[in-house]
Amino acid sequence: MKIKKAIVTGGTSGIGLAICEELLSRGTEVYSISRNPEKIKPRENFHLLKLDLSDLGAVSDFGSSFLKEYGTPDLLVNNAGYGAFYEWKEFPDDEIQRQINVLLSSPIILCKFFAPKMELQGKGTIVNISSLATLYPLPYMPLYNAGKSALSSFTQSMMLEHSGSLKWIDFRLGDIRTSFNESAPKQIEKSQSESMNRAWLQIEKQLNESPSAKFAARQIYQSIKKNKSGTIFGGGFFQAKLAPLFYRFLPFLGLIKVLKFRYR
């Protein structure tokens, strides 16, 4: 599948930027969507557009204006996201809504705008980057786990509705070495329990030992290249291959015990 025009959310850093670079290297015209496009410089075929995905009204306006100004893309990658690390009793109310908007509502709205147009043009792929956290939730990140799980379920629902020219990919990505943890809103350290501190150290360890964003971007591109709908696991060998298999044979209570032991 030749990708002429692509939209990538969260395309100024980490996995999003790596996806943009992968597409640009293959001759695709790329539109990177982010809150702070000034972080990087535009260049030939690389367009930087400003959008706050927590503002649902702005997301709807963006969908309409993009179609009018640039036309229908061949590829939409809903990559933008972040995790917030809090005990549930301390989780800020505004952060709850913001995470739902960024992780779930905005990707769904963008799909609503672009999927019908892709069908009309007879080709298109939508990649929704979910997470291995749909199977193995992260402690103290309940809204991240919930948002990614819901996005995964939404993508699978779209696979039921669409066939033929429009492809849907639920890409469940494991840990990738990015600045994800550095940018995460966190409960102030002096109020964190000992169990929170230990969980955060384990999450940091996993991230630091993970594959690069460039590695993940290549996996994502290869999934697009297959031109098929489906659920795909990405990341290092254990998380992409063994963890999904292990999950199939693990009872729910057993899973909770394993996760509590890992993050204790």
Regions found by a protein language model. Give the residues of each.
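Residue(s) in the substrate-gating loop at a strand-loop-helix junction
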Residues: 131
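SDR active-site lid
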Residues: 160-231
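Conserved glycine-rich cofactor-binding loop
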Residues: 12-13
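Rossmann-fold cofactor-recognition segment
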Residues: 44-57
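Conserved NAD(P)H cofactor-binding loop of Rossmann-fold oxidoreductase domains
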Residues: 79-84
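Active-site helix of classical SDR
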Residues: 111, 147-150
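Substrate-binding pocket helix/loop in short-chain dehydrogenase/reductase
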Residues: 87-88, 95-100
